[in-house]
Amino acid sequence: MAIAVLRGGEDLLIGRWGVLVVLAGLMSGCGNGDTLEHFGGPTMGSHYSIQYVRHSATPGPKAVRAEVEQILADVDRQLSTYRSDSDIERFNALPANSCQVMPDPVLELIRVGEQLSSQSGGAFDLTVEPLLNLWGFGPQSREEKVPGVEALAQVRQRVGHGHLRIDGDRLCKDAAVEVDFNSIAAGDAVDRIAARFQALGIDSYLAEATGELKAAGRKPDGSAWRVALEAPRDDQQVAERVIEVDGYGVSTSGDYRRYFEQDGTRYSHAFDARTGAPVLHNLASVTVIHPSAMMADGLSTLLLILGPEQGWDYAEKHDIGVFFVLRDKDRFVTRSNETFERISRGKTQ
C-alpha cells in the first residue's frame, strides 16, 4: 500500500496497490464542539487509518484505538496466512479428510466465499493459495515464473471451493486445500470496525485497512468524506476520479502493481480458479461501492477476474456500483454504471 502526506488543502493519501486513495482534510474541530480525531498503524503487512468525529457522547481516541486494534488482532489471529498459529493456517496444514473447529467469523467468510464462487461460476475461489505460490505471488512463493504443465495440473487438484464443507462449528476438507482470505479479509476487518463504531455511538467516521474502507456521516464542518480513485500508473499517484461516500464501503482491485513478464506476456496476481492461471484481459482495475466493505472487497476481485464483459454484466445483473479502468492500446479508458454514479453523488435511490 502506498502512503503519502499531501501538503495542501487535503492532508492524507492512502492507497492499495496504488489504486485506491483516500482524501480527507484533517480538521481540529468546529464551533459546535465536535472534533475530527485520527490515528493509524501497521496491520496485515500494510497499514490502517481511522478518522472519526468525536462529540460529548463518544469515547476519546485512546479508547477507540484500543477497540480497533483488538479487532485487527482478532482478524490477524483468525485469518492471517503469514503466521503458522492463525486459525486458517492451522487448518491449511491439515491433510485431506480433516476437520477443525473454527470461530463463527471464519465460518461466515467461508460462506461468503462459497456464494461468490458459485455466482462467478468458480472464477472466484478462496482456495487458490497453492496456485499463487506456484506462480510466484503467494506467501510461500520462491520465484515468479510460468509453471510447467505437470506442476500446474498437480496443484490444481488441491484447488476448489467444492473441497470445503461446514459441519456445525467445524470446517472440513476432502482434499489438501489451503484457504486464503486475502480477497475479503481487509474488508471484513473494516466491517467489524464499523459495527463496533455503531455500538460506541460513533456515527461519522472513515475506517480504512490496507486500502479497503468504509465511510459514514459527515466531518465536523458538514463536508463529506471524499475518496479518490487513482489512475493505474506505476510511476506516480494521479487521481482519476473523486467521489463522496456516506454509508458505503469502497474497494479497488487492480492488476498492474503485482505482475511479471515472460516471453512477451504479462502475468498478474489476479487468478481465475477455473483455468489455474492469471487473467489476460484488458481490465486494469475495478472499483466497487457496496454497503458492506467486505462485499466490496470480494466483488472487486471477482469482477477483475471475470473481465470487462462478464464482469460488467455481473455488476449490472446484481445492481453493483462499479468503476472500470481498461487498457486501450497505450492509454486507459474508464467506464462506470448508473448505480455507481448515483451512489457517488450521495443518492441511494
What are the functions of these language-model segments?
Residues 2-8, 13-15, 23, 28-349:
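Mature catalytic core of soluble alpha/beta enzymes
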